[in-house]
C-alpha cells in the first residue's frame, strides 16, 4: 500500500475537498474506470484511467477531483476549483491537465514500487458527484534460474544428489515446478523458500533431492502468477560407472608388468640361492666321508702275526 503522506495541511485539503463533494448531489456525473486491474512493472510508470462526461459549457473551475487510497482514505492527488493541488505521494503522481477539460481524470504514477500496490478511488464532482475504484497490481519478472549440484563431481548411479534452483528479484511470490526429462512433475523431496529484500522483491530458492540414475535431466520452472511469465532452468546429470581413464590404465599395466618382472627375478634369485646351498651341503657331505675313511685306516689294529714278528726281532 502507499505510505508517507503529507502533514496536517494535506488533511485539511482532503477534508475541504470531501466537504465540497458531499455538498453536491449524486446523480448525473458518471465516473468510469477500468474493470480489470492495472498491472505495472516495478520502476516503470503506470496510468490509472478514470474518465467522466463533461456537459456543454463545462470549465475546470467547476471541477473537484480527488484520487485517494480506497482502504485508508489517504490522499494521493487532488485538483480543486481549477487548481492542481499537486501530489501528496512523494511527487510521483500527476494528472493530465490538458485532457481534464475533455473528461480525462486519469492519474499518472511514476517509478512504481511494490508498496504502491492496492486500490485507488477516483472522485469527481462538478455539479453532481460520482466515484469509482481501480486496482493496481505490481509485478517484477524473475531472473533465469541458476542450477547448482551437491555433490558436483564423481557422481555414480545410486548417489543422492541435491539440486538447487535459484531465481531473483521477482514479485509477487513465485510458483515453482520441477519436472524430469520425460516431463513428469516431481513433487516429493522438494523444499522451496522465498524471502523479500528491502525493496519487497523476492528471491526464490527451491531444492530437489533425487537418487541419481544412469542419466537424467531435471528442469525447474519459476512462474510469475501476475505476469504469467515463466523462467526456465535445467540440468542434465550423468552417473558414470567406475572406469579408469586411459592414462590410469597404462600406468596400471606398466606397474603390473614391473611387478611380474620383479617377482620372476626374485624367484630366480631364490632358486639360485637354494641351488647353491644344496651344492654346498653336498660338497660338505663328501668331504666328511673322505675324512672318515682315512681315520679308519690309521686306527686299524695290528694283527697277531705282526706282533710276534716284532717280538722276535726284539729278542734276537
Swiss-Prot record:
Cytoplasmic membrane side: 270-316
Ranges facing Extracellular side: 29-248
Gene knockout outcome: Mice display a lower bone mineral density in cortical bones with femurs more susceptible to bone fracture, but do not exhibit any important skeletal abnormalities. Calvarial cells reveal normal number of osteoblast precursor cells with adequate proliferative capacity, but have impaired osteogenic differentiation. Furthermore, following cardiac transplantation, they display permanent survival under rapamycin regimen and cardiac transplants also show markedly decreased production of key cytokine and chemokine. The incidence of chronic transplant rejection is also inhibited.
GO molecular function: identical protein binding; signaling receptor binding
Disulfide bonds: 165-220
Domain Ig-like V-type positions: 29-139
UniProt induction comment: Up-regulated in cells mediating rejection of mouse transplant.
UniProt-listed Gene3D superfamilies: Immunoglobulins
Keywords: Disulfide bond, Glycoprotein, Immunoglobulin domain, Membrane, Signal, Transmembrane, Transmembrane helix
Region (Disordered): 280-316
GO cellular component, one term: external side of plasma membrane
Pfam families in the cross-refs: C2-set_3, V-set
Topology versus the membrane: Single-pass type I membrane protein
InterPro entries documented for this protein: BTN3A2-like_Ig-C, CD276_IgV, Ig-like_dom, Ig-like_dom_sf, Ig-like_fold, Ig_sub, Ig_sub2, Ig_V-set
Location of this chain's protein in the cell: Membrane
Carbohydrate attachment residues: 104, 189, 215
Domain called Ig-like C2-type: residue spans: 145-238
Principal location class: membrane
Biased composition, class Acidic residues, residue ranges: 280-292
Note from the entry: Gene transfer of B7-H3 leads to complete regression of 50 per cent tumors, or significantly slows tumor growth. In primates, B7-H3 locus underwent genomic duplication leading to tandemly repeated immunoglobulin-like V and C domains (VC domains). The dominantly expressed human B7-H3 isoform contains tandemly duplicated VC domains. In contrast, mouse B7-H3 transcript contains only one single VC domain form due to an exon structure corresponding to V domain-(pseudoexon C)-(pseudoexon V)-C domain. This duplication appearing in primates is suggested to be very recent supporting a model of multiple independent emergence of tandem VC repeats within human and monkey species.
Family recorded in the similarity comment: Belongs to the immunoglobulin superfamily. BTN/MOG family.
Subunit note: Interacts with TREML2 and this interaction enhances T-cell activation.
Name listed for the protein in its UniProt record: CD276 antigen
Organism: Mus musculus (Mouse)
Amino acid at each position: 500500500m502507499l505510505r508517507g503522506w503529507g502533514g496536517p495541511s494535506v488533511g485539511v485539503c482532503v477534508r475541504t475537498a470531501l466537504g465540497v463533494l458531499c455538498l453536491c448531489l449524486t446523480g448525473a456525473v458518471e465516473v468510469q474506470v477500468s474493470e480489470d486491474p492495472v498491472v505495472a512493472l516495478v520502476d516503470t510508470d503506470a496510468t490509472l484511467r478514470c474518465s467522466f462526461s463533461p456537459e456543454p459549457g463545462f470549465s475546470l473551475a467547476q471541477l473537484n477531483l480527488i484520487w485517494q487510497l480506497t482502504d485508508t482514505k489517504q490522499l494521493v492527488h487532488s485538483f480543486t476549483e481549477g487548481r492542481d493541488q499537486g501530489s501528496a505521494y512523494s511527487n510521483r503522481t500527476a494528472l493530465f491537465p490538458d485532457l481534464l477539460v475533455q473528461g480525462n481524470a486519469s492519474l499518472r504514477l511514476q517509478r512504481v514500487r511494490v508498496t504502491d500496490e492496492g486500490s485507488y478511488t477516483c472522485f469527481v464532482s462538478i455539479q453532481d458527484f460520482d466515484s469509482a475504484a481501480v486496482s493496481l497490481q505490481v509485478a517484477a519478472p524473475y531472473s533465469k534460474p541458476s542450477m547448482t549440484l551437491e555433490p558436483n563431481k564423481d557422481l555414480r548411479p545410486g548417489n543422492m544428489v541435491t539440486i538447487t534452483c535459484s531465481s531473483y528479484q521477482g514479485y509477487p511470490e513465485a510458483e515453482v515446478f520441477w519436472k524430469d526429462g520425460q516431463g513428469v512433475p516431481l513433487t516429493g523431496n522438494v523444499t522451496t523458500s522465498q524471502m523479500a529484500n528491502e525493496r519487497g522483491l523476492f528471491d526464490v530458492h527451491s531444492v530437489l533431492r533425487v537418487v541419481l540414475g544412469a542419466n537424467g535431466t531435471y528442469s525447474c520452472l519459476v512462474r510469475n502468477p501476475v505476469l504469467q511469465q515463466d523462467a526456465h532452468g535445467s540440468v542434465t546429470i550423468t552417473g558414470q560407472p567406475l572406469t579408469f581413464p586411459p592414462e590410469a590404465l597404462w600406468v596400471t599395466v606398466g606397474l603390473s608388468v614391473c611387478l611380474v618382472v620383479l617377482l620372476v627375478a626374485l624367484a630366480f634369485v631364490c632358486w639360485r640361492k637354494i641351488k647353491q646351498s644344496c651344492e654346498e651341503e653336498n660338497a660338505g657331505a663328501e668331504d666328511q666321508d673322505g675324512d672318515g675313511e682315512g681315520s679308519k685306516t690309521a686306527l686299524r689294529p695290528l694283527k697277531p702275526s705282526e706282533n710276534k714278528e716284532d717280538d722276535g726281532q726284539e729278542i734276537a
